[in-house]
Amino acid sequence: NGAKISRFNRVTDIITLPTGGYEVITEQGNIIAEHVVNAAGCFAPEVGRMVGAHVPIINLEHQYLITEDHPDIAALVKEMPVTRDSTASAYICQEGNGLLVGPYETRGSKPWAIKGMDWNFDRELFAGDLVRLMPWLERCMELVPLFEEVGVKTIINGPITHTPDDNFLVGPVAGLTNFWNMTGASIGIAQGGIGKYMAQWMVHGQTELNMASLDSRRFGPWADKKYCITRAIESYERMYASASPTENRPHGRPIRTSSLHTVMAQKDAVHFVSAGFEKPAWFKTESIREESETWTHNEAHAVVAEECAAVQNTCGITDISGTAKFRVTGPDAYAFLDRLSCNKLPTKDGRISLTLFHAENGGIMAEQTVSRINQEHFVLMGAIGCQIKDMQWLQQHVGDYQVTIEDFSEDWGGVLLTGPKAREILQTMCEDDLSNNAFAWLSCQTIQLDSAPVFAMRVSYAGELGWELHMPVWQLISIYESLMQFGQPLGLQDFGTRAFNSMRMEKMYRAYGAEFTEEISALEAGMDRFLDLSRHFIGSENLLQRQTVGLSMQLAYLVFDDQIPAECFGNEAVFANGDHSGIITGGAYGYRVEKSLAFAYLKPEHCKAGQALTVETSVGTRHCHVEVDSAYNPNNSLLRS
């Protein structure tokens, strides 16, 4: 039906209608809208506040200059290419017969309008401040000597929006229906693509592209103004910095912590952050206190090896509080989750299953570990980075189902106790029977630890005998300290996410955001044994169609044949017989098997066992082959022990 553009017409308020939709109040009259898109740029936080939405955006000043003409540039036959240089933290390109030079200062950047925007502001520019830019302009002159031969014609200084991670804010706004963000752009050349996928999202409810890194729901209320300012400045000043996999940016932290955070810090944990949540990555030793930023194995490599060895030989414990947790209750709880789940739900109380939720287009929307308490009570656990998105996915599919959904992620914490001595340690402080007959693998029950009820799940992402122990946050320190008291004489040791990731790779366990994304279905991800296509669930028709037509790519498990001290981290190109076959999703060194491991999506014909491959990595070409079984304990005897 076309569209109407109304210019010079300020929106003064937005009213959420009880019948659905919105009434947009403007200076020239009111508009009833089914959908509202917040594409207000610098004003986006103000517009968000009209409907009670938090928009984590900060404006920063950015300057660029245009030079006078230079005869050498005028004489060019082809236009000079756009150049970006990390040492100058700047972009340089041709502008007419002169240059356009835009540095991102790596210190001293200036936030703007942090107390709120003036509604009378309209494309005004600020006074230029070349003195602030001189260190980077001088480096640009070294890179392009003719730059110092010309005068400055124009200085442009204006506000640009920045988010805490410098990615767009796109997609549904949590807690609202049909209210969307399309803002937070600090780069000016991507709006066409963003518009395309935004349209798909609004019309179809999902996109063909994985939008996780842009999804505005990756930030929750925890991303307050102080955090946004600090992180946005850091992101701006590191715009052209080359980040290593071990880079650990300190600003704006900690913002989300486990109740064990201080305890872990006192034990020399090195915390990394995921969705704002602090997670111990590895623990310093007397001899190894720091790690270098590098793409190869660094000082922490030996420490992580010791942590993995403890898990394999005795027992390890790690904080798993940074997990999204949902409680689904009500008469229709089973039927509701059955409609979302691609796997059969547990039919017996106290059983656990792993499942995936799909969109209608077949993309994986969520990975959940589902624990059945009873027919009307289920507990779901998933990735902390998907907490808000997963909650909204659950809520938007409630329909006529009689269910209640509770997010208790912030209220409960937990630890994983795993290793061959896990049962012995746990049994010393627990009167419940923890034998295989009484507490089988992939089952759950409430047990008593220190006379306190703890929700115990017999699962271990590390691939050893183990229990996840979940409890209210106020219990966590006491339970952890008791476990350490009883466990240390038996060799119990802390371990972090670095070791955890290594062990999940050895077990061939996929991860959401890497092997599972909205561009992938359970079929491509090789999750056939967790997929029941005999029943109808959201996305099942698309999966049946994919199964009939055939897959264009499949997930392969790669074991490296060389001993190069470096790993894959994602997005490396994979080749078979010299032809490009696919891309790495992630990798790690397997300390228990002493091999480098990775996952990759490849052409199906290259996913057979033994297929030789090469991978282009940061340290050069590496050789590997495909395996179809996990590198560590493929028959799961240790998990079942």
Task: Give the positions of each predicted feature.
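A conserved beta-strand/loop element that lines the FAD pocket in flavoprotein oxidoreductases
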Residues: G2-V11
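Short Gly/Pro-enriched turn/cap motifs at secondary-structure boundaries
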Residues: V55-N59, M80-R84, A90-Y91, G151, ...
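Short loop segments at secondary-structure junctions
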Residues: D69-D72, E95-N97, T106, V173-A174, ...
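Short, low-complexity Ser/Thr-rich regulatory SLiMs
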Residues: I15-P18, Q94, P172-A174, V370-N374, ...
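Flavin-dependent oxidoreductases
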Residues: T12-A127, P135-L143, Y227-N248, G252, ...
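C-terminal catalytic lobe of FAD-dependent flavoproteins
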Residues: T87, G96, K110, N120-I255
